[in-house]
């Protein structure tokens, strides 16, 4: 399964690449598909490519939901470990 996630642009390197913050990590991504990007913009990232700009509020909501899902998965794994 592939997942596209919101990321924040931290630095523009050139017309085709930028540095994005992904879960606290900085990674170079391809931004060739988008115009008029600025530092601080949020984009949807899929397999290393920024696909579209995203409103900051929507990006934050999505990131919060993903964090919640991660916590749920951790709790389920812990519960399965306790059942053994």
Curated annotation (Swiss-Prot):
It holds the Pfam family HupF_HypC. SUPFAM superfamilies: HupF/HypC-like. GO terms for biological process: protein maturation. PROSITE patterns: HUPF_HYPC. InterPro entries: Hydgase_assmbl_chp_CS, Hydrogenase_HupF/HypC. GO terms for molecular function: carbon dioxide binding; iron ion binding. Pathway: Protein modification; [NiFe] hydrogenase maturation. Gene3D superfamilies: 2.30.30.140. Belongs to the HupF/HypC family. NCBIfam families: hypC_hupF. Involved in the maturation of [NiFe] hydrogenases. Involved in the biosynthesis of the Fe(CN)(2)CO cofactor. This is Hydrogenase maturation factor HypC.
């Amino acid at each position: 399964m592939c997942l596209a996630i919101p990321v924040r642009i931290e630095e523009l390197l050139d017309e085709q690449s930028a540095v994005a913050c992904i879960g606290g990590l900085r990674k170079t991504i391809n931004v060739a598909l988008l115009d008029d990007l600025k530092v601080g913009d949020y984009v949807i990232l899929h397999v290393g490519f920024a696909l579209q700009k995203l409103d900051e509020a929507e990006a934050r909501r999505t990131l919060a939901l993903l964090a919640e899902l991660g916590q749920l998965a951790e709790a389920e794994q812990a519960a399965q470990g306790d059942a053994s």
